[in-house]
Amino acid sequence: MDLITPEIGLFFWQTIVFLILLFLMAKFAWKPILGSVRNREQSINDALASAEKARKEMQNLQSDNEQLLKEARAERDAILKEARELKEKVITDASDEAKVKADKIVADAKRSIELEKQSAMAELKNHVAELSVEIAEKIVRKELSGKNEQHQMIEKMIGDAKLN
């Protein structure tokens, strides 16, 4: 137990050494240690503030990026919608134009057919008239080959003329 209980002289010298050490540390080391601790504390606070600022900046950038993405998507959708509308318009215009051209071609074909038909009918009438004249001429020559037949024909024509 003697080892655990310090003596008064030892206790006195330990206290004196402690106070001298405390004085020397306060005089020479305490200010640099406190300055170093303060500097460290300040650098930690600055780092925390910088990290918080960077976090807020990241949030702002992220929200800006999301906004830009939304705008880009909206613009893309608008461009796609406009492209679809333009495609539909082009298809409709082409279809209408093709229909108009087809109707014109059909009308021209009908007109051409009608003209060809009228031309063929006129040609046929002319041909029939020529044939009729030839046949009539042959018949008249045959019938009027004698004098007696000529007198009969003249009398018949006079009779027909009186009736009409």
UniProtKB/Swiss-Prot annotation:
HAMAP family per UniProt: ATP_synth_b_bprime
Keyword Nucleotide-binding in annotation: no
Subunit field text: F-type ATPases have 2 components, F(1) - the catalytic core - and F(0) - the membrane proton channel. F(1) has five subunits: alpha(3), beta(3), gamma(1), delta(1), epsilon(1). F(0) has three main subunits: a(1), b(2) and c(10-14). The alpha and beta chains form an alternating ring which encloses part of the gamma chain. F(1) is attached to F(0) by a central stalk formed by the gamma and epsilon chains, while a peripheral stalk is formed by the delta and b chains.
Protein name: ATP synthase subunit b
Membrane topology per record: Single-pass membrane protein
Cellular component, GO annotation: plasma membrane; proton-transporting ATP synthase complex
Organism classification: Bacteria, Pseudomonadati, Bacteroidota, Flavobacteriia, Flavobacteriales
Keywords from the named record: ATP synthesis, Cell membrane, CF(0), Hydrogen ion transport, Ion transport, Membrane, Transmembrane, Transmembrane helix, Transport
TM ranges: 8-28
Family, per entry: Belongs to the ATPase B chain family.
Organism of provenance: Christiangramia forsetii (strain DSM 17595 / CGMCC 1.15422 / KT0803)
Keyword flag Lipid metabolism: no
Function, in words: F(1)F(0) ATP synthase produces ATP from ADP in the presence of a proton or sodium gradient. F-type ATPases consist of two structural domains, F(1) containing the extramembraneous catalytic core and F(0) containing the membrane proton channel, linked together by a central stalk and a peripheral stalk. During catalysis, ATP synthesis in the catalytic domain of F(1) is coupled via a rotary mechanism of the central stalk subunits to proton translocation. Component of the F(0) channel, it forms part of the peripheral stalk, linking F(1) to F(0).
GO molecular function: proton-transporting ATP synthase activity, rotational mechanism; proton-transporting ATPase activity, rotational mechanism
Top-level taxon: Bacteria
